[in-house]
């Protein structure tokens, strides 16, 4: 067959040589001396071709060079056996590629040759890089006899066997190899232990980190939930509220342009206090800014402990509606009026709650400017809630900076300035005055009169339509407000001192017949502390009632945290962190000890049926509380079968009336027989007033100012009225709305208690469940006020007329046998300030 190219010749030669090797084995190699070189050349060509096939994606130029070198080697190695060709054909380029070997299926042969080359290298080079003795011993001429000594019949067989053979090494290398292997295993073991330890530490750190991050994650989840809820609310806003969503019940408060109702949400059945502001009155009184400010501040203070929450607002064509928290126990003032004064423990607790409320407000740059007992509400747990932010002020950053550097103005002391102040107070408009601030009801049942120095009633009588130019209430306003000074949080600290004084003493510290007198006392800081006033409380009040705002206790403290006030001895023992979670001390009828006298508390339990209701009895009581007069409905008369010394027939009544006409007190009895009379000291807190007390056949208990000869009021009669004597001088008279503290200087307290109880049984019967006269020691303290009511004043107590003639002896005391004159003496219509 004629060959057309060198490549075909080489291919054919290689194929023949491979077939010869397979058939003849070693003998073929021995017969052909040049076969070794030819085999090597062929193997080289095949190896290069295989490498080219495997790395065909690499640089083509380098592979082409390798192929050319292999071709040259193969040509030089086979010159002895290959026939000579023409020179022009011999100079042709020889090209060996993968396609040539693919055609004759020599890929398997390339793999075998590569394995043989690897075996040769492993057997002749040890692990340390030195040439082994096997290579030196087998350096024969042909280099093929070493395969025979190893038991292989051909290089191919040796190549196949090399896949399972180990590396040929020297003994020294094997020893080094074993040491290295052992060291490697030890390193692996140590690294595994270190990894296990690190893994445990990582797990522990991860768990602790998870525990630390858990609260933060919960907060983040809550924030995300709140944000999602807000987004949902924004996307799906709640339907607008209207008056039709609430059932309006009784009204619980009234202002100059608003009325507060108790209402029930028809959807949730929750009770709310809804303040209804009439738009017409707001425009007439120019209260637009007050309404906006109140809404803004209430939104800011909502969900803050100690403040009334604003649930929602809405409006219609006539009114604006503020839906607020309903304070079930009402405001604090009726409690002070009811029990006369708080004990020290009760005062300490509520003063601490007010201090916390001031800290919350001032931390948010809010100054209330009208703190007073009427604006301090009590929830169902008897904790305080601050309300009525119509006079509040939100301080800007600039105003707050000025407040810290505030210098008080010079006090106005000369008479010219006083005259100017008087003119200003009489002529300027009023921003604070409303019906709520007009009425300070101390619980006395008077004929539109006030027994003691009640400033608010005197304001109303002095100038009912007078206007003033400041924001606040007269008894609690600070000097800097009267002097038109900058408004600072110290104004609320002044009011706090006034409230602490009133809780202990029973009356505000500044009192007078009109606003001007009160303002003069405030500017002079004329505070009188009666006997029995707690010393620590007195020190606290003195440090709070300073004319210069900078000198007040707490004024130099950081905004929102009054550390100096908290550290005052009066607040010793207060746990500020859990104050609002504690149960407040019960409010007992309390008579502070004066001089050497002991403190007295009552043991009689007042009926707790003062909650608002819809029956006729409750409506009558609410109506009397709203109008400030007693009920005109006569209580049913229950006849007692037992003989009573006060049960007089008509003839006896006429005889007694004729005898008492010459008595100067007859004119105050309104045609009724005076059964018992005597001078008593009527106590309210730490203040006492001398009064003439009359017990008549009404039954009525009338007390009169013996100096001015003015009827001051009456103690309202009811089946629930009880008398309780504490000793020979002091006795209490309990009514559903108030406890009256009376002191008989002549020592007839027991006689008074028996007389009052006999008259009650005569008028209303003698139920077996009630005792005749109550007596308890001064240490008893079981009487607690458990529900709220307005202290109802009554000038016309229900009178029960007796018609059946029953013989009865006259009163036992000498003062009861005095005759009365036949003519009625007129009384002065005016009322002057009682002496302190």
Swiss-Prot record:
Sequence segments annotated as region (PIF-pocket): 277-322
UniProt superkingdom: Eukaryota
Disruption phenotype: Death during the second instar stage.
Ranges where the record places region Disordered: 206-245, 401-464, 788-836
Bias-annotated ranges (Basic and acidic residues): 401-415
Chief site of localization: cytoplasm
Compartment(s): Cytoplasm
Catalysed reactions, semicolon-separated: L-seryl-[protein] + ATP = O-phospho-L-seryl-[protein] + ADP + H(+); L-threonyl-[protein] + ATP = O-phospho-L-threonyl-[protein] + ADP + H(+)
Biased composition (Acidic residues): 416-452
Gene Ontology biological-process annotations: apoptotic process; cell differentiation; cell surface receptor signaling pathway; insulin receptor signaling pathway; intracellular signal transduction; negative regulation of apoptotic process; negative regulation of TORC1 signaling; phosphatidylinositol 3-kinase/protein kinase B signal transduction
Active site: 370 (proton acceptor)
Entries under Pfam families matching the protein: PH_3 (PF14593), Pkinase (PF00069)
Family: Belongs to the protein kinase superfamily. AGC Ser/Thr protein kinase family. PDPK1 subfamily.
Name listed for the protein in its UniProt record: 3-phosphoinositide-dependent protein kinase 1
Organism per entry: Drosophila melanogaster (Fruit fly)
Gene: Pdk1
């Amino acid at each position: 067959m004629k060959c057309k190219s060198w490549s075909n010749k080489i291919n054919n030669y290689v194929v023949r040589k491979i077939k010869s090797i397979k058939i003849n084995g070693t003998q073929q190699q021995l017969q052909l001396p040049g076969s070794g070189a030819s085999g090597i050349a062929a193997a080289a060509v095949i190896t290069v071709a295989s490498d080219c096939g495997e790395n065909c994606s690499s640089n083509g130029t380098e592979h082409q060079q390798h192929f050319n070198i292999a071709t040259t080697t193969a040509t030089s190695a086979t010159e002895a056996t290959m026939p000579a060709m023409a020179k022009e054909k011999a100079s042709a380029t020889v090209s060996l590629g993968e396609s040539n070997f693919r055609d004759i299926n020599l890929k398997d042969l390339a793999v075998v040759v590569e394995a043989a080359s690897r075996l040769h290298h492993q057997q002749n080079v040890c692990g340390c890089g030195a040439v082994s003795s096997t290579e030196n011993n087998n350096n024969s001429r042909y280099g093929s006899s070493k395969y025979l000594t190893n038991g292989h019949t051909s290089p191919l067989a040796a190549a196949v066997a090399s896949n399972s053979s180990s590396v040929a090494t020297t003994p020294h290398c094997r020893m080094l190899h074993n040491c290295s292997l052992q060291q490697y295993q030890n390193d692996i073991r140590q690294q595994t232990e270190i990894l296990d330890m690190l893994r445990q530490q990582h797990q522990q750190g991860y768990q602790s980190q998870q525990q630390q991050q858990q609260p933060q994650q919960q907060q983040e989840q809550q924030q995300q939930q709140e944000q999602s809820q807000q987004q949902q609310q924004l996307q799906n806003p709640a339907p607008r509220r209207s008056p039709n969503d609430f059932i309006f019940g009784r009204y619980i408060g009234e202002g100059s342009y608003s009325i507060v109702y108790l209402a029930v949400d028809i959807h949730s059945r929750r009770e709310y206090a809804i303040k209804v502001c009439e738009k017409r009155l707001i425009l007439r009184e120019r209260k637009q800014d007050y309404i906006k400010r109140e809404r803004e501040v209430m939104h800011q203070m909502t969900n803050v402990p100690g403040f009334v929450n604003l649930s929602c607002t809405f409006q219609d064509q006539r009114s604006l509606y503020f839906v607020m928290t309903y304070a079930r126990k009402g405001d604090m003032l009726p409690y002070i009026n009811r029990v006369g004064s708080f004990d020290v423990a009760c005062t300490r607790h509520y003063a601490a709650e007010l201090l916390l409320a001031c800290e919350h407000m001032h931390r948010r740059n809010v100054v209330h400017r009208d703190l007073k007992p009427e604006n301090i509400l009590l929830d169902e747990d008897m904790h305080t809630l601050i309300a009525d932010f119509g006079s509040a002020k939100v301080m800007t950053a600039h105003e707050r900076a000025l407040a810290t550097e505030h210098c008080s103005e010079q006090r106005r002391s000369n008479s010219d300035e006083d005259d100017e102040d008087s003119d200003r107070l009489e002529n300027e408009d009023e921003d604070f005055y409303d019906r709520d601030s007009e009425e300070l009801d101390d619980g006395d049942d008077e004929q539109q009169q006030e027994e003691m120095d009640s400033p608010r009633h005197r304001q109303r009588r002095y100038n009912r339509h007078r206007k003033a130019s400041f924001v606040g209430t007269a008894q609690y306003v600070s000097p800097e407000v009267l002097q038109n000074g900058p408004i600072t949080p110290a104004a609320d600290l002044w009011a706090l001192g006034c409230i602490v004084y009133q809780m202990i003493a029973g009356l505000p510290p500044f009192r007078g017949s009109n606003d001007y007198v009160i303002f003069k006392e405030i500017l002079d800081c004329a505070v009188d502390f009666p006997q029995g006033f707690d010393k620590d409380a007195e020190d606290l009040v003195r440090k709070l009632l300073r004319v210069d705002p900078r000198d007040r206790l707490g004024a130099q403290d950081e905004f929102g945290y009054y550390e100096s006030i908290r550290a005052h001895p009066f607040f010793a023992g207060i746990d500020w962190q859990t104050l609002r979670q504690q149960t407040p001390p019960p409010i007992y009828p309390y008579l502070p000890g004066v001089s050497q006298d002991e403190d007295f508390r009552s043991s009689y339990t007042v009926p707790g049926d003062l909650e608002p209701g819809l029956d006729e009895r409750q409506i009558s009581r609410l109506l009397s509380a709203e109008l400030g007069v007693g009920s005109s409905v006569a209580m049913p008369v229950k006849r007692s079968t037992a003989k009573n010394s006060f049960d007089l027939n008509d003839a006896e009544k006429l005889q007694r009336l004729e005898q008492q006409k010459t008595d100067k007190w007859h004119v105050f009895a309104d045609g009724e027989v005076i059964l018992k009379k005597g001078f008593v000291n009527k106590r309210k807190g730490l203040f006492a007033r001398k009064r003439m007390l009359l017990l008549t056949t009404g039954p009525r208990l009338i007390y009169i100012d013996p100096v001015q000869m003015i009827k001051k009021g009456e103690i309202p009669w009811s089946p629930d009225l009880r008398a309780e004597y504490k000793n020979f001088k002091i006795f209490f008279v309990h009514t559903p709305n108030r406890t009256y503290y009376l002191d008989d200087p002549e020592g007839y307290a027991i006689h008074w208690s028996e007389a009052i109880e006999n008259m009650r049984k005569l008028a209303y019967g003698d139920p077996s469940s009630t005792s005749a006269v109550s007596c308890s020691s001064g240490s008893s303290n079981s009487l607690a006020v458990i529900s709220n009511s307005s202290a109802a004043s009554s000038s016309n107590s229900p009178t029960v007329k007796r018609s059946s003639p029953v013989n009865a002896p006259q009163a036992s005391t000498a003062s009861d046998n005095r005759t009365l004159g036949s003519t009625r003496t007129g009384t002065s219509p005016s009322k002057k300030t009682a002496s302190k």
